[in-house]
Every structure is written in structure tokens, then in C-alpha cells.
């Protein structure tokens, strides 16, 4: 968590250097920087990004190019570009959507992708016109295993820790030295090939998860668990001394198998002095009502909640401001670490709870509150598809969030944690203002009946005058028990072994 005060002088110097280092030439993504050499047109963004793992099985493939696709290519796109399974080589049936007059393309699978499987894009011999085929062929990713159900849909083999970021980075970040090891702002996010038994999960002197410094002292931290995901968030910035992460005694929920003891030693990189920039989220839609995402073509800062129960018209619109901490850029020339501190809050508009999208349920969600549970970590990196100075830089962010609703009954149905939410986007400077356009997919549980899917088209803009930027809001409401299950009404229906669930505001 962030507890270091940042002076205005530090902010101005560090932010200016960071923008100069990573965002030089990014006046937009129009490719309008002239030079005497011919730069081939290329893919400049993909979600999932190359080598991304733990991709939700409901995720679309979002592409953006340095120039618009030719009409001939668009008319024949279903035969020129396919999404293919690595496992059997079969082509995935998708619906194609052209975005921003051909600058972008979205591929929406007609059914859920298989869990824990690898996929890639294939360009046929006809190609994509002026767009470099090899840049598109770099898009390869692996879907997340299931969070419930048969063990084979979660992952294969014995109970295994798949990764512990940032100790283990995805292939896109692994070769970048500035991103290949933890820093003093790091939160540790672990994913496993089986769901973790909550009764075996604890942090502390005798806990199954421990983080100790060079003196052997336990580092104060918070631990969050959801299915196959485990997050360890240090309460304070880590000191640049040797630390050891130990996991011992953790068990798989389905089989009871114990994880082999895990030990990793590292020295965090110091990121001071940092810049802190306040980014506006919620006022953008009101200021520019017709503004849509350049990546998805959807309205910005809305989270559609699409499911069989709710239909495909429900959404919550986000509002609020976020503070982003940026590491001292001269020390990180190839990947600048960034952080959104835990406790940051975004507000969401009420969600329409209509059965099958048509029949009113009588439930009123009220305002939806989304709280950043742990420090969200990420990087600003050079564009992985092109080294042209005219293309925008990549922004990557991993976050954990808690969602609650103001209404009592809906809160019991919708209140939940969403761990390991992976955000990918583009960072540009427009008229001297840092702008982030990003994409992510969340899969919240709906009414305890099914998992919904929400494609987040995120847009954030830094306030031009950071001296007068508003302070991001925190959730300062006193903690209250809002509902519980089985509750007073349904106790006669409770069975031995049923959990007691407490839902707070």
C-alpha cells in the first residue's frame, strides 16, 4: 500500500521524465509522424496481449491497427483471419465487428472458449492488405481454468502453482529487465491449477503463506483468496532488502492434495521518487456523451453484465477518480512500474435486474461500489508490435476488486470479490494530457445461478492541472452487516453443512 507523501516538485519532474521516456511521439495512434523510411502498417494492440495467460473463457479478441483495414479485406475478413485452437487446430466460430472505421476489429466467439487451453490467430495467404501478417500472428494466449466443476477443466496434473507474479512474468514482460522482478510497490498474485482449500489458507507466523524480510521478520500483509487465485498485498512499501516468499501446507480443495513447499527469494527494486497522477474516470461520459472506446467501439467506462438470467442489456456505468503512482522513469527505461493503491473506489450506476432481460425481478441494486482490494500493479512498456515512435505505448495492470450493491437483497446476490482482473490498454498523450484506453473482461456471479461476462471499455484521462485535481474518494462508511444467509426467513430450508454467508456494505 502507498504511504509515501509525494511533493508537487517530485510529481512534475518524474511525470515529465516518464512521459518523455515512454510516450514520446505519442500524440495519438494515427501513425502521422513522418520520416524518410517506410514503416509497414502493423497491429498496434491486442487483447489478450501476446502470451497472456488466465484469459477469461468469455473474452473476445480485440485488435487495433496502425491504419484502417481496406474495404476489400473487411468484406472478406471471415476467410482471411481466424481464431484457432492449439489443441486440435480447429477454427473457433466467431462474430466479427469492425471498430472505428476499420482501425479496429473485434472477434466475439459464438460460444465460450475451452478452459485451460491455448489459442492463436491465423492469417491466411490472402493476408490483411497493408497490415503486416506477422504482427497479427504474434497474438497467442491461454484461457483460464474453471473456478469450479470437474478438476480437469481447471488444469491438469498434480496440484501446482502456475505462476506468482511479478516473480513469474508472462512472456511479454519476461525479457524486459525492468519488469522481470518485483519492486517496492509489488503485490504478489498467485494462480494454481486447482482451487485452493480455504481452510488451509492463512497468513501469519504459523500460516501457510509467509513473506519475511532479511531479518526473518514477517512482513505485515493482507491475503485474499478466490478459487484458484491467491493475492498477497504488503501493507507498506517493501524495503530494498532480501525477502523470502514461502508457501507450505496449502491444499487443493477438490482432492486435498498438498502443494510442495515453495520458496522464492528476491530483492525489490526501489521506485522512488515517484510521480502521482490523478486520473478522471466518471466525468468523461458526461463531458462527451457520444464518446466510445477506440478499442472496442463500446461506450466508455460501462461494464455490461451479460448472462442468461439478466439478458444482454444490463450494465453499470463507472464514475470516480483514481490516483496512479508512477516509478521514477530514468531508473526504468524499458518498463515503468505503476500502481493504483488499495482502497481506491469507483461508483457504479444501478444494474437492471430483469429476468432474461425482460421480466422485472423486483430487485433494486441501488448504487454499485467497486473497491480496489489490493494495490493494482502494472507497467508502461514500449509497444510490442512496432518500434515506430508514432505508435502508442502499452499499459498493463493487474487488479483485485470487491463489488457491493446498496440494495440489501441484490447485495447478497451480487456482493463478491473479483481477483486477478487483467487490464491491457494503450497510453498516449493528447494535447499534453495522458490518456489511457484499456480493455478487460470480468466474470461476476449473478444471483448465485451463473457467471456473467462483462467487457470493460475503460478510459482514463489525467487532469491537466494536477495541482487542483480532486483527491480520489475512499470508502469511509462504517462497516455494517447488510445481509446473511440462510437469514431469518430461510433457516428452515438450511441443510447440515451449508455455509453461513455474511454480506457487508
Question: What is the predicted role of each segment?
Answer:
Residues 2-13:
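Bacterial N-terminal signal peptides that target proteins for export
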Residues 22-25:
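C-terminal motif of bacterial Sec signal peptides marking the signal peptidase cleavage site
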Residues 27-82, 115-120, 124-125, 132-208, ...:
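N-terminal non-catalytic regions of secreted/periplasmic and cell-surface proteins
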Residues 87-96, 214-222:
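Surface-exposed loop/edge segments in extracytoplasmic proteins
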Residues 101-107, 226-232:
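Aromatic sugar-binding surface patches on proteins
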Residues 111-117, 235-242:
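Surface-exposed, short loops/turns at beta-strand junctions within beta-sandwich domains
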Residues 200, 256-260, 267-486, 490-494, ...:
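Extracytosolic secretory-pathway proteins
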Amino acid at each position: 500500500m502507498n504511504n509515501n507523501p509525494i511533493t508537487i516538485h517530485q510529481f512534475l519532474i518524474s511525470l515529465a521524465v516518464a512521459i518523455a521516456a515512454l510516450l514520446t511521439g505519442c500524440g495519438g495512434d494515427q501513425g502521422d509522424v513522418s520520416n524518410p523510411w517506410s514503416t509497414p502498417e502493423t497491429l498496434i494492440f491486442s487483447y489478450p496481449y501476446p502470451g497472456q495467460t488466465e484469459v477469461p473463457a468469455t473474452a473476445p479478441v480485440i485488435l487495433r491497427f496502425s491504419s484502417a483495414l481496406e474495404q476489400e479485406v473487411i468484406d472478406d475478413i471471415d476467410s482471411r483471419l481466424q481464431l484457432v485452437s492449439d489443441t486440435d487446430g480447429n477454427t473457433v466460430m466467431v462474430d466479427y465487428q469492425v471498430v472505428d472505421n476499420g482501425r479496429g476489429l473485434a472477434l466475439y466467439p459464438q460460444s465460450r472458449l475451452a478452459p485451460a487451453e491455448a489459442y492463436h490467430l491465423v492469417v491466411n495467404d490472402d493476408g490483411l492488405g497493408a497490415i503486416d501478417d506477422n504482427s497479427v500472428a504474434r497474438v497467442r494466449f491461454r484461457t483460464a481454468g474453471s473456478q469450479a466443476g470437474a478438476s480437469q477443466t481447471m488444469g491438469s496434473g498434480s496440484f501446482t502453482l502456475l505462476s506468482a507474479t511479478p516473480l513469474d512474468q508472462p512472456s511479454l514482460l519476461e525479457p524486459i529487465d525492468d519488469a522481470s522482478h518485483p519492486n517496492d510497490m509489488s503485490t504478489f498474485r498467485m494462480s494454481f491449477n486447482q482451487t485452493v482449500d480455504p481452510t488451509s489458507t492463512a497468513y501469519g507466523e504459523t500460516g501457510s503463506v509467509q513473506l519475511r524480510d532479511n531479518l526473518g521478520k514477517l512482513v505485515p500483509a493482507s491475503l485474499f483468496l478466490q478459487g484458484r487465485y491467491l493475492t498477497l498485498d504488503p501493507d507498506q512499501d517493501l524495503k530494498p532488502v532480501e525477502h523470502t516468499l514461502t508457501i507450505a501446507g496449502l491444499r487443493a480443495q477438490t482432492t486435498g492434495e498438498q502443494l510442495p513447499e515453495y520458496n522464492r527469494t528476491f530483492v525489490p527494486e526501489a521506485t522512488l521518487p515517484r510521480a502521482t497522477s490523478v486520473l478522471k474516470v466518471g466525468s468523461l461520459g458526461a463531458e462527451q456523451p457520444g464518446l466510445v472506446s477506440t478499442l472496442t467501439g463500446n461506450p466508455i467506462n460501462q461494464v455490461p453484465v451479460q448472462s442468461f438470467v439478466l439478458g444482454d442489456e444490463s450494465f453499470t456505468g463507472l464514475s470516480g477518480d483514481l490516483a496512479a503512482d508512477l516509478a521514477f522513469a530514468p531508473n526504468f527505461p524499458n518498463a515503468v512500474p505503476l500502481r493504483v493503491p488499495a482502497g481506491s473506489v469507483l461508483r457504479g450506476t444501478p444494474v437492471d435486474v430483469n429476468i432474461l432481460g425482460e421480466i422485472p425481478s423486483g430487485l433494486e441494486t441501488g448504487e454499485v461500489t467497486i473497491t480496489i482490494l489490493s494495490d493494482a500493479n502494472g507497467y508502461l512498456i514500449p509497444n510490442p508490435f512496432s518500434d515506430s515512435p508514432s505508435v502508442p505505448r502499452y499499459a498493463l495492470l493487474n487488479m483485485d476488486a470487491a463489488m457491493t450493491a446498496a440494495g440489501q437483497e441484490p447485495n447478497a446476490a451480487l456482493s463478491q470479490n473479483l481477483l486477478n482482473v487483467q487490464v491491457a490498454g494503450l497510453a498516449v498523450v493528447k494535447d499534453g494530457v495522458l490518456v489511457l484506453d484499456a480493455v478487460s473482461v470480468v466474470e461476476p456471479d449473478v444471483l448465485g445461478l451463473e457467471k456473467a461476462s462483462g467487457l470493460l471499455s475503460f478510459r482514463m484521462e489525467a487532469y491537466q492541472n494536477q495541482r487542483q485535481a480532486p483527491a480520489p474518494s475512499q470508502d469511509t462508511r462504517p462497516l455494517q452487516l447488510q445481509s446473511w444467509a440462510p437469514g431469518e426467513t430461510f433457516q428452515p430450508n438450511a441443510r447440515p453443512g451449508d455455509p453461513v454467508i455474511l454480506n457487508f456494505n
